[in-house]
C-alpha cells in the first residue's frame, strides 16, 4: 500500500487522519467500519483509482447526505445497514453493506446496486494493484 501511495500522483497531500478526529466523527455519528478506520488512521483517503475512498473531511460532508439518500432511495434495495466510504465519477456513492461486508455502489439514476468488491480489503488490494500497474506502465513510457 505504501508503495502504491508513493507512485500515485493522486495521493499527494493525502495523509493519515488524527485518531481524535476519527473519534469525534464516531461520537457524532456512528462507528467507522474497522478496515476503513484503519485506512483513515494510516493513510487517509484513497485516490489510487476508482472508486475513490473518502478522507475524513469528505466523510464528514458525505455522511449526512448519505443518510438522507439512504432513506429516500436506498431503502428500497436489498442490502443490510450501509456505511458510505467513497464514490465514482458517475456520481455513484460507494458503501459497505455492514451485514455482508460487500462493497457496493448506488447511483440514484439507475435501478440497481452495483457490486464493486467482495469486501473492503479486496477493494483496497485491487486499487493498490491498479496503481502499481499504472506506475509500471508510466515508467515504461
Locate each region found by the language model:
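Short acidic-glycine loop/turn motifs at beta-strand connectors
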Residues: 97-100
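Catalytic Cys-His active-site segments of thiol-dependent hydrolases/isopeptidases
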Residues: 104-109
Amino acid at each position: 500500500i505504501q508503495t502504491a501511495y508513493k507512485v500515485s500522483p493522486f495521493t499527494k497531500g493525502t495523509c493519515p487522519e488524527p485518531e481524535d478526529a476519527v473519534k469525534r466523527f464516531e461520537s457524532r455519528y456512528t462507528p467507522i467500519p474497522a478496515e476503513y478506520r484503519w485506512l483513515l488512521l494510516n493513510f487517509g483517503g484513497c485516490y489510487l483509482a476508482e472508486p475513490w475512498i473518502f478522507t475524513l473531511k469528505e466523510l464528514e460532508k458525505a455522511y449526512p447526505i448519505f443518510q438522507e439518500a439512504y432513506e429516500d432511495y436506498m431503502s428500497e434495495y436489498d442490502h443490510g445497514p450501509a456505511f458510505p466510504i467513497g464514490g465514482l465519477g458517475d456520481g455513484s456513492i460507494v458503501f459497505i453493506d455492514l451485514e455482508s461486508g460487500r462493497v457496493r455502489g448506488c447511483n440514484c439514476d439507475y435501478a440497481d446496486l452495483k457490486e464493486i468488491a467482495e469486501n473492503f480489503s479486496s477493494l483496497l488490494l485491487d486499487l493498490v494493484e491498479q496503481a502499481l500497474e499504472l506506475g509500471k506502465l508510466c515508467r515504461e513510457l
